[in-house]
C-alpha cells in the first residue's frame, strides 16, 4: 500500500517485505514482478506536475503488440485505468528509459551507450513541439547555447529537459499546453522568458550579459486546462468482481502485516533485556517487515557496546529501519567503538561520526574495511591534520564521471577496492574515511559539498579538490522574513526557494525543512548573485510567482522580506448546502449538516484511503493537526466501511467524524446544485461557511489542500 517517504528508493524486495512504498517504489516493484514472470514492463515518470507540487510514477505493460498503463500497486478493473489518468492529461512531460540503443518514433530526451530516455507524453496528453531560437541582440543565430525548459514545481523552476541550440540557433521540446519558463545560458550571456505553449509555437531569446541588475519580476503560470473526464464506465458485474479481488488482496496484506512484531511482544522482550519499553517499541514498530533484523541487531549490540545502541538507531530514518541489515548496523557500531573520538557532544557525534548514512544511498558495511586498513601512522597524522585525508583521496582515487551512467553512488568499500569513483561517490568516500578516523564529516546541506570538522571543533571546513572549484571564502548573512500573514506556514520547497548563480546557472540551495513560521531567520551563505522565488498555488492549479533577483555582497547582512502574490478576483459562493442535509455517523447517530455548518462552518470530505490522492490529504491533516484542532471546524468524512481500517494508524484532527452517505445521496444532491461542476475525481472536499455557502471545492490530485482549507 502507498506511503510517502524520503527520496531514497527501496529495492523491490524491501518494498514487498514491508508491504508499503511510495509511487516510485511501488512502480519499481511492479515492473520487477512483471519482468520476473516474462511480461515486458517499464516505469514511466512525470518529473513534475504542472497543476500541483509533486511528481508521479506508474507502470506500462506490453500486451498484444502495444503498451498499456496501470497503477503500480493500485489495482483497477482493467488496463488503461488509474486515478492518475486525468492528471496525466494535464502533464507537460512523461518519460521513460529504454535499455540499449533503442530507435523509435518517440522524441529522444537523453542518450548514452547503455540507454535512451524517451518522451511518451503524447500517449497521455495533448502535446506539441515548442521551438526556442537563441539569437544575439542583433538577431543573429547562436549555436551551442544550453536551453532549459523549466516548470514551476515545489517552489522552484525545475528543468524538465535541457537542449543545445543547433546552427540555426534552434532547439525544441515536445510538451503539453501549459506555461513554461525558458532559460538560456551561453558563457557570460543569458536570457529567459515565459512561454505560453498553448498560444506559441516559437519563442526567441536574445542573449545579453547575465545576470543583470537587481529586480523583481511577477509572472503567472498556468497548467494545461482540465478537459472533460474520459468515460471509464465498466459493467457492474466487472466492478463487483474487482471489489471482491480487492477485499481478498487486502486480507492477504493484513494477514502478512499481522506477522510483524506487536507491542506486547516488544514489552516482554524489553523486560527480559532491561530496556525502556517505549523506546524499544518505537524502533521495532517502525521496522515493520524488517523487525527480525533490527531485533537481532539490538540483541547483539547489547553484548558489545550498549552505550552506542540508541544513538545509532536514532540517526536512522524510518526507511533505514525497514531495510537495513543487522550485520551492516553491527559493522558500524562495533568499529565505531574502536575509534578514539575527541568529540564530546553526543548528538553531534551520532550525526556526523557514528552515522552510517552518508547521503541517500542504501546503507552498506564500510567502516570495518576502512578501520582495519588504515595504518596507525596515517590515522594519527590525519586526525591531527584532516587535509592529509583530502590529499590521500586526491592522490589515490581516480574520478570517472562517464561510466556510472545511472548515477547510483558506489559504496565506500567499492571505491576503496577499485580506487575509481564518480564525483559524488568520491565525496561520499571521503566522508566515510573521515568518520572511520573519528572525524565529523558530512555533505554541506546547502551545496552538497564534502566538509569535515577538525578534531574537537564544530567548525565545518569545505574540501577543495581542485583550486578552481573552491567555494567563495567570503560569506554573508541573509536575513529572511515573511511579510504575508495569509501564508500560515511559509515552507521552503513549497512556498519559496533560494538559488545561487554558479557555473552559468541558478542552483537551488538545499534547505529542506526550513520554515519562516518564526521569522526573521538568519542564513550564512556565500556571497554572489541570488534568485528568491515565491509561489502561491491557486485552486485551479495555476501559480502566481514572484522572482527576486539580488546581489549579496560579502561580509555583510542583507534583509530579504519575502512576499506572495494574491489574486485580485474575489470569488462568490459556488452554491448552497442543500436544506435538510442529514447523514448518519458510524455510531448510527443522525448528523444535521445544516446546523453544524451554521454553528462553526463545515468541511465535507469524500475520501478513498486506498488511493494516493486521498492519502496525501490524510497525511496533510496529520501534519497540520494542531492548526485544525485550534480552528475546530467540524470535518465529516465519507469513507467506505471496507476502507476505514486504514485510518487506525492515522493521528487525524479530533473533530473529524466518519459518516455514511448511502448510494452517494448527499453527494448527488450537492452536485445537482453546482450546475456544470461534476464531483467525480477522488478526493472531493467542500468548505462550507456559517451561511451554509459552499465557498471552496477541491477534487482530484493536488498537494497542499490541507493548508488551503485553513
State the predicted function of each range.
Residues 1-18, 237-418:
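Secondary-structure boundary elements
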Residues 153-175, 502-519:
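Short, acidic Ser/Thr/Gly-rich low-complexity loop/linker segments typical of extracellular
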Residues 593-617, 621, 634-636:
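Short active-site neighborhood of thiol/selenol oxidoreductases, capturing the structured segment around
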Residues 1-14, 18-111, 181-183, 376-381, ...:
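Hydrophobic/aromatic-rich core segments of domains that either
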Residues 681-699:
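A short, hydrophobic beta-strand/beta-hairpin element that forms part of a small beta-sheet core
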Residues 636, 648-682:
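Short, internal strand/loop/helix patches
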Amino acid at each position: 500500500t502507498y506511503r510517502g517517504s524520503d527520496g531514497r528508493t527501496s529495492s523491490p524486495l524491501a518494498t514487498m517485505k514491508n508491504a508499503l512504498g511510495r509511487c516510485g517504489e511501488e512502480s519499481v516493484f511492479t515492473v520487477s514482478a512483471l519482468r520476473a514472470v516474462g511480461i515486458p514492463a517499464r516505469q514511466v515518470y512525470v518529473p513534475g506536475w504542472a497543476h500541483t507540487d509533486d511528481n508521479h510514477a506508474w507502470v506500462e505493460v506490453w500486451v498484444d503488440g502495444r503498451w498499456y498503463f496501470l497503477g503500480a500497486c493500485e489495482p483497477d478493473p482493467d488496463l488503461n485505468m488509474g486515478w492518475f489518468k486525468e492528471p496525466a492529461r494535464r502533464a507537460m512531460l512523461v518519460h521513460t528509459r529504454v535499455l540499449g540503443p533503442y530507435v523509435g518514433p518517440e522524441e529522444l530526451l537523453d542518450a548514452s551507450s547503455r540507454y535512451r530516455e524517451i518522451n511518451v507524453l503524447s500517449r497521455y496528453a495533448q502535446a506539441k513541439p515548442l521551438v526556442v531560437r537563441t539569437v544575439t541582440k542583433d538577431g543573429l543565430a547562436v549555436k551551442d547555447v544550453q536551453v532549459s525548459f523549466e516548470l514551476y514545481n515545489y517552489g522552484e523552476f525545475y528543468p524538465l529537459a535541457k537542449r543545445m541550440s543547433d546552427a540555426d540557433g534552434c532547439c525544441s521540446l515536445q510538451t503539453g499546453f501549459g506555461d513554461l519558463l525558458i532559460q538560456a545560458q551561453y558563457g557570460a550571456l543569458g536570457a529567459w522568458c515565459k512561454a505560453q505553449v498553448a498560444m506559441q509555437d516559437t519563442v526567441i531569446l536574445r542573449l545579453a550579459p547575465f545576470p543583470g541588475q537587481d529586480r523583481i519580476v511577477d509572472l503567472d503560470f498556468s497548467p494545461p486546462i482540465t478537459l472533460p473526464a474520459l468515460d471509464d464506465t465498466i459493467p457492474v458485474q466487472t466492478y463487483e468482481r474487482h471489489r471482491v479481488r480487492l477485499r481478498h488482496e487486502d486480507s492477504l496484506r493484513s494477514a502478512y502485516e499481522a506477522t510483524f512484531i506487536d507491542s506486547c511482544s516488544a514489552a516482554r522482550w524489553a523486560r527480559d533485556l532491561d530496556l525502556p519499553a517505549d523506546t524499544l517499541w518505537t524502533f521495532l514498530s517502525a521496522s515493520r517487515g524488517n523487525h527480525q533484523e533490527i531485533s537481532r541487531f539490538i540483541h547483539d549490540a547489547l553484548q558489545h557496546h550498549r552505550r552506542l545502541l540508541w544513538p545509532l538507531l536514532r540517526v536512522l530514518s524510518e526507511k533505514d529501519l525497514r531495510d537495513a541489515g543487522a550485520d551492516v548496523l553491527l559493522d558500524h557500531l562495533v568499529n565505531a567503538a574502536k575509534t578514539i573520538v575527541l568529540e564530546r557532544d553526543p548528538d553531534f557525534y551520532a550525526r556526523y561520526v557514528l552515522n552510517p548514512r552518508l547521503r541517500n544511498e542504501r546503507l552498506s558495511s564500510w567502516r570495518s574495511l576502512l578501520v582495519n586498513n588504515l595504518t596507525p601512522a596515517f590515522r594519527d597524522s590525519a586526525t591531527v591534520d584532516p587535509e592529509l585525508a583530502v590529499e590521500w583521496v586526491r592522490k589515490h582515487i581516480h574520478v570517472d564521471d562517464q561510466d556510472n551512467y545511472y548515477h547510483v553512488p558506489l559504496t565506500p568499500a567499492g571505491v576503496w577496492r577499485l580506487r575509481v569513483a564518480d564525483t559524488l561517490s568520491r565525496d561520499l568516500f571521503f566522508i566515510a574515511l573521515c568518520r572511520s578516523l573519528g572525524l565529523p564529516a558530512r555533505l554541506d546541506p546547502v551545496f552538497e559539498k564534502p566538509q569535515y570538522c577538525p578534531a574537537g571543533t564544530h567548525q565545518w571546513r569545505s574540501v577543495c579538490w581542485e583550486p578552481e572549484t573552491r567555494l567563495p571564502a567570503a560569506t554573508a548573512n541573509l536575513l529572511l522574513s515573511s511579510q504575508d500573514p495569509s501564508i500560515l506556514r511559509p515552507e521552503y520547497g513549497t512556498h519559496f526557494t533560494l538559488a545561487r548563480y554558479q557555473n552559468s546557472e541558478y542552483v537551488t540551495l538545499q534547505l529542506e525543512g526550513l520554515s519562516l513560521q518564526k521569522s526573521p531567520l538568519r542564513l550564512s551563505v556565500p556571497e554572489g548573485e541570488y534568485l528568491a522565488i515565491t509561489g502561491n498555488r491557486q485552486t485551479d492549479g495555476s501559480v502566481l510567482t514572484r522572482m527576486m533577483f539580488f546581489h549579496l555582497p560579502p561580509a555583510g547582512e542583507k534583509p530579504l522580506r519575502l512576499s506572495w502574490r494574491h489574486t485580485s478576483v474575489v470569488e462568490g459562493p459556488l452554491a448552497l448546502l442543500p436544506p435538510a442535509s442529514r447523514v448518519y455517523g458510524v455510531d448510527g447517530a443522525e448528523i444535521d449538516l445544516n446546523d453544524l455548518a451554521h454553528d462553526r462552518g463545515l468541511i465535507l470530505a469524500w475520501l478513498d484511503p486506498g488511493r494516493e490522492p486521498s492519502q496525501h490529504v490524510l497525511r496533510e491533516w496529520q501534519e497540520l493537526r494542531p492548526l485544525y484542532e485550534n480552528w475546530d471546524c467540524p470535518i465529516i468524512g465519507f469513507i467506505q466501511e471496507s476502507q476505514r481500517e486504514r485510518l487506525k494508524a492515522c493521528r487525524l484532527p479530533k473533530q473529524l467524524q466518519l459518516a455514511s452517505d448511502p448510494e452517494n445521496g448527499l453527494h448527488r444532491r450537492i452536485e445537482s446544485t453546482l450546475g456544470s461542476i461534476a464531483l467525480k475525481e477522488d478526493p472531493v472536499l467542500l468548505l462550507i461557511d456559517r451561511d451554509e455557502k459552499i465557498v471552496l471545492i477541491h477534487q482530484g490530485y493536488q498537494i497542499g489542500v490541507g493548508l488551503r482549507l485553513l
